[in-house]
């Protein structure tokens, strides 16, 4: 034995602590935006096409965290990679991979209980499934997606964000969850009906954003760089701006439809379930989550 307590011939490998690995990313900040995309229903995303179920095949699996429960409940995770990847990584994505805007899915209907550590299935749309390039691309995609999962720790740190933004909001326009990665804050909004997407998206601007109209959800992803330092006051300003955009979308929907819009009756109870999972690791039963309070 050596004086340092390490057996002779063995060296200690430098490892990061779990705390530093799970904190939101403060290093590798991305530069300011060069080109900004806008959520639109007239044109496809310039880099990430819509998901085609005929060509999709699973390439990897990544375990989630309790802080990503907001995405688990909607069973889809939309990742606009052009917002969070570097220029070199985007070159790899364009030339070597065939990834859609919503590359991660999950099935929670078999267990009907959410504990926060479910596995996400990542898929691609290449023409040669099972090839070496497909397998290697799946590993690269999994490493990027793990950073996205770690970035969902934003919901653990600012657990009040959803409660403030969704206060008295109708179910037609709701905030789902957030991701903070490389100085970029991704804000996920869900528009309930397809007709509302056709009314809201052309009538207003969400800024640097992306739109995904999938099988299960209609998701608008907003990108915010104002709260890059993760200070409390800047995040609260971000929440106020997000709520202002949501209220504008609600007004557009109210003008286009004749039905009255009421505040979501289940949202407050759902927030209690999510808070109990994040703070006390209490699992969420889907029957209780979807039930309407009397």
Swiss-Prot record:
One of its GO terms (molecular function) is metal ion binding. GO terms for cellular component: host cell cytoplasm; host cell nucleus. Plays a major role to prevent cellular inhibition of viral genome replication by nuclear bodies. Assembles an SCF-like E3 ubiquitin ligase complex based on the cellular proteins ELOB, ELOC, CUL5 and RBX1, in cooperation with viral E1B-55K. This viral RING-type ligase ubiquitinates cellular substrates prior to proteasomal degradation: p53/TP53, LIG4, MRE11-RAD50-NBS1 (MRN) complex, ITGA3, DAXX and BLM. The keyword Iron does not apply. This is Early 4 ORF6 protein. Interacts with E1B-55k. It is found in: Host nucleus; Host cytoplasm. Belongs to the adenoviridae E4 30 to 34 kDa protein family. Keywords: Early protein, Host cytoplasm, Host nucleus, Host-virus interaction, Inhibition of host innate immune response by virus, Metal-binding, Modulation of host ubiquitin pathway by viral E3 ligase, Modulation of host ubiquitin pathway by virus, Ubl conjugation pathway, Viral immunoevasion, Zinc. It comes from the Viruses. InterPro entries: Adenovirus_E4_30/34 (IPR007615). Its main location: host cell. A motif (Nuclear localization signal) lies at residues 239-255. It comes from Human adenovirus C serotype 2. It holds the Pfam family Adeno_E4_34. The keyword Methyltransferase does not apply. One of its GO terms (biological process) is symbiont-mediated perturbation of host ubiquitin-like protein modification.
